[in-house]
UniProtKB/Swiss-Prot annotation:
Descriptive protein name: Glutamate-1-semialdehyde 2,1-aminomutase
Modification sites for N6-(pyridoxal phosphate)lysine: K268
One protein family per Pfam: Aminotran_3
Positions of disulphide bridges: none
C-alpha cells in the first residue's frame, strides 16, 4: 500500500535497515507495511519523522511517555546524573528513593527488586512464585502478553498475535507444559483448572486490564474472584502491571479496582522513557530472592542510576490532577469514536479505562482473546493508514492499545477527532 504522505527518506532508511536489522526493526511491533516511518525527534505528544512529517502520538512508545516526549524535568535530571556516572555495579541512594516511591504507591508493595524490562520482571516473579510454593505449574490467560520469555510465550498477544506467531517456535514443549491456559473473564474455567491441578499451581499471572490484545476490561467482580480463589488454594496472585502500573492510578490497577495481589510487576512508566522493570510484593516472598534467599535473580544494569533517576522524576509528576486530566482526554476520544462509528454505520466496540483506550471493528462485545481475534483486522489497518495520512499515529495493530498523555491538549484532541471522522467515513 502506498501512503498519501511524503516518506521518501523513511523508505530509503528502511531499505538500508533491512540489510542489518532483522525485518528492518528491533521489535516486531514496530513493523508495518509497506514500511514504518523513521523518527528523527519527538517532543510533547508529537513525533517528527525523517521526511519532516509531524504525527500526534497515541502510541507513546507503547506506554511509557505519560509526561510526553523529551520532558524537560526528566532530561535535566538525567543529564545531571550522567555527569555523576551511568552505571556503577554497586548500590546508590537513588535506588532506595525510587523503591520507597513504588512501595508508597502500589498496595501490595513491601519490597522491590529493580530489573531492566517488563520481560525480566515477569520472568523473575514467576520464578519467585515457583520457588516459594515449590510448585511448577502456572496459569496465564489466553491473549495475555507477559514478555518474550519461554514460560509465557504461548497463545500470547501483542506483536506475537499481530504477526501470526502467538506460539513461538524455538520453545521446547517441556518448557510450556506447566503453563495452563484459560480464557480471561471465565470463572468456571479457573475453577476447573485449579481443581484438576490441585496443589500443583504456583501462581496465576494476569494483566488486570489486557492491554496487549487491545483493551479488554475485567468483568465486575472477576479480579475479586481471582483474589479469593488463589487465597483459598495457596496460589500466588501476580498482577502484571507493566502497562497499568502508574497509569490507571497512583497505585495502578490494584488501587483502581481495590484488589491487592501478592506480587506485581511494573515497568514502562516507571522508567520515564529509559529501560527499567521491577518486581514487588509481600516481604515474606520478596526476601526469598538472593542474597537473602535461595531464588536467584541478578542483572548488570539492575537499578541503573540513569533509569532510576528518570523514574524518580516521573513519579513526582503523577498526582491526582494528572490522572484526572489524562482520563478525561481518553474519555473524550472514546466517546467520539463510538459516536463516529455509529454515525457512519461502522460496526465497532470501544473500550477505555483511565488513559487507555482502543476500538475493535467488531459487532460483539470483547471480553476474551477469541472475541478480540474475531475483529476485522483488515478494516483496522485501513483505519490506521488513514489516521497516519492525517497526522495521527496509533500502534499499527488491532491488538495493542492507545494512550493519552498530559501533553495531549484541546487543540490536539480536535485535530485527532477530525482525523478519526475522515477515517471512519472512508470505512
Amino acid at each position: 500500500m502506498e501512503l498519501n504522505i511524503k516518506m521518501d527518506r523513511s523508505r530509503e532508511l528502511f531499505e538500508e535497515s533491512r540489510k542489518y536489522l532483522v525485518g528492518g526493526v528491533n521489535s516486531p511491533v514496530r513493523s508495518f507495511k509497506p514500511f514504518p516511518f523513521f523518527v528523527k525527534s519527538a517532543k510533547d505528544c508529537f513525533l517528527y519523522d525523517e521526511d519532516g512529517n509531524e504525527f500526534i502520538d497515541y502510541c507513546l512508545a507503547y506506554g511509557p511517555m505519560v509526561l510526553g516526549h523529551a520532558n524537560e524535568n526528566i532530561l535535566n535530571a538525567v543529564k545531571s546524573q550522567m555527569d555523576l556516572g551511568t552505571a556503577y555495579g554497586v548500590p546508590s541512594e537513588k535506588e532506595i528513593i525510587l523503591a520507597k516511591e513504588v512501595i508508597n504507591r502500589i498496595p501490595c508493595a513491601e519490597m522491590v527488586r529493580f530489573v531492566n524490562s517488563g520481560t525480566e520482571a515477569t520472568m523473575g516473579a514467576i520464578r519467585l512464585a515457583r520457588g516459594v510454593t515449590k510448585r511448577n505449574k502456572i496459569i496465564k490467560f489466553e491473549g495475555a502478553f507477559h514478555g518474550a520469555h519461554d514460560y509465557v510465550l504461548v497463545k500470547t498477544g501483542s506483536g506475537a498475535l499481530t504477526h501470526g506467531a502467538p506460539n513461538s517456535p524455538g520453545i521446547p514443549e517441556d518448557t510450556t507444559k506447566n503453563t495452563l491456559l484459560i480464557p480471561f473473564n471465565d470463572e468456571d474455567a479457573v475453577k476447573k483448572v485449579i481443581s484438576e491441578n490441585k496443589d500443583e499451581i504456583a501462581c496465576i499471572i494476569l494483566e488486570p486490564v489486557m492491554g496487549n490484545v487491545g483493551c479488554i476490561l475485567p468483568k465486575d467482580g472477576y479480579l475479586q474472584f481471582l483474589r479469593e480463589i488463589t487465597e483459598e488454594n495457596g496460589i500466588i496472585l501476580i498482577f502484571d502491571e507493566v502497562i497499568t502500573g502508574f497509569r490507571l492510578s497512583k497505585g495502578g490497577a490494584q488501587e483502581y479496582y481495590g484488589i491487592k495481589s501478592d506480587l506485581a510487576t511494573v515497568g514502562k512508566i516507571l522508567g520515564g522513557g529509559f529501560p527499567i522493570g521491577a518486581i514487588t510484593g509481600k516481604k515474606e516472598y520478596m526476601e526469598q530472592f538472593s542474597p537473602n534467599g535461595q531464588i536467584y535473580q541478578a542483572g548488570t544494569f539492575n537499578g541503573n542510576p540513569v533509569s532510576v533517576t528518570a523514574g524518580i522524576e516521573t513519579l513526582k509528576n503523577l498526582d491526582d490532577k494528572f490522572y484526572k486530566e489524562t482520563t478525561k482526554k481518553a474519555d473524550i476520544l472514546s466517546s467520539f469514536l463510538r459516536e463516529t462509528a455509529e454515525k457512519y454505520n461502522v460496526p465497532a466496540k470501544v473500550y477505555n479505562v483511565a488513559s487507555i483506550f482502543q476500538i475493535y471493528f467488531n459487532d460483539k462485545e470483547i471480553v476474551t482473546y477469541e472475541d478480540a481475534k474475531s475483529s476485522d483486522t483488515e478494516k483496522f489497518m485501513r483505519y490506521f493508514y488513514t489516521l497516519l495520512e492525517n497526522g495521527v499515529f496509533i500502534a499499527p495493530s488491532q491488538f495493542e492499545c492507545c494512550f493519552t498523555s498530559i501533553k495531549h491538549n484541546d487543540e490536539v484532541l480536535e485535530k485527532t477527532m477530525n482525523a478519526i471522522d475522515i477515517a471512519m467515513k472512508k470505512l
